[in-house]
């Protein structure tokens, strides 16, 4: 597994940047830049850089966007390019680039402190990885942002929405009469914590699961994942690595005959959560136990469910 040292260095510097904005905290994990008393009407959810905002991270903010829309705010999303379809399909206004003149408040993650520290707009930075969070992440963001904005306490849906009209024209490799396990053994942000031992555990598990269920295995991943991986996977029935887009992955995971997921804790896992399907997860870990405990308790999944054993089992 290739380790992105530059990415990890940026994450370390970001932790230092957070220390310098602690004085502007409005909650244990939320910080406000450029506080003013102007009436807030338009809100931008800003996270356009993949290195700082992976695909799965986008999903955590959709329930907040949904809640703000319901509260009468004009919501715009600035996601990474490959996630624009997700928000557009759900009816949100998507902003690829440009000025912020028509925006009253920017909401983003602390990972974007450097990008926005010179902004003249009000910016609400959220530390979504804080072990101080004591609720499921989607619920927590809605509750705290709602309190900041002085919104009335109305009901909300903390489960990220799933687009309806995704299309399966790029999934012609599927046999709709068969049942499938989706398998992904790649990680981005956790690569420094994942090695050959973890790969063996994951591969041994899915081999046994395939025999036990009789399901076919679809191997997913990017073009880069496939190019950097010389292993031969004799248990894989369909190698879809590099053959599908992020949108296609959403479509794949939504199908009725795609029943199980085996992966690290990433996008694929969260898509299965959203469809109330079972994932077998090899946790990529965290350096500190309190951070690992937080992720397992409040991010996997990021919303409350009373049937957690039906959607996740750790390997």
Regions found by a protein language model. Name each.
Residues 54-64, 71, 188-219:
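Conserved catalytic-core segment of nucleotide-activated headgroup transferases in glycan assembly
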């Amino acid at each position: 597994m290739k380790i992105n040292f530059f990415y990890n260095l940026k994450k370390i510097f970001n932790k230092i940047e957070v220390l310098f904005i602690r004085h502007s905290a409005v909650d244990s994990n939320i910080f406000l830049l450029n506080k003013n008393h102007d009436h807030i009407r338009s809100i931008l959810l800003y996270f356009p850089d993949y290195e700082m905002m992976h695909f799965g991270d986008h999903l955590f903010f959709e329930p907040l966007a949904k809640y703000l829309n319901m509260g009468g705010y004009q919501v715009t999303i600035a996601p990474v390019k490959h996630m624009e379809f997700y928000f557009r399909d759900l009816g949100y206004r998507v902003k690829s680039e440009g000025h912020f003149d028509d925006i009253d408040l920017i909401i983003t993650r602390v990972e974007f402190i450097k990008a926005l520290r010179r902004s003249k707009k009000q910016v609400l930075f959220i530390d979504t990885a804080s072990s101080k969070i004591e609720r499921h992440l989607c619920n927590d963001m809605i509750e705290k942002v709602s309190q900041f904005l002085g919104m009335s306490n109305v009901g909300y849906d903390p489960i990220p929405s799933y687009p309806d009209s995704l299309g399966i024209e790029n999934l012609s490799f599927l046999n709709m009469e068969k049942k499938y396990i989706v398998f992904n053994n790649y990680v981005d942000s956790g690569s420094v914590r994942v090695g050959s031992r973890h790969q063996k555990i994951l591969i041994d598990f899915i081999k046994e699961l395939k025999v036990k269920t009789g399901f076919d295995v679809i191997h997913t991943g990017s073009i880069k994942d496939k190019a950097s991986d010389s292993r031969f996977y004799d248990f894989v029935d369909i190698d879809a690595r590099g053959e599908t887009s992020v949108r296609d992955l959403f479509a794949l995971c939504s199908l009725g005959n795609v029943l199980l997921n085996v992966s690290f804790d990433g996008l694929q896992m969260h898509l299965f959560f959203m469809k109330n399907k079972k994932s077998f997860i090899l946790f990529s870990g965290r350096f500190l136990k309190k951070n690992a405990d937080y992720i397992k308790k409040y991010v996997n999944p990021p919303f409350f469910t009373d049937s957690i054993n039906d959607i996740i089992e750790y390997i």
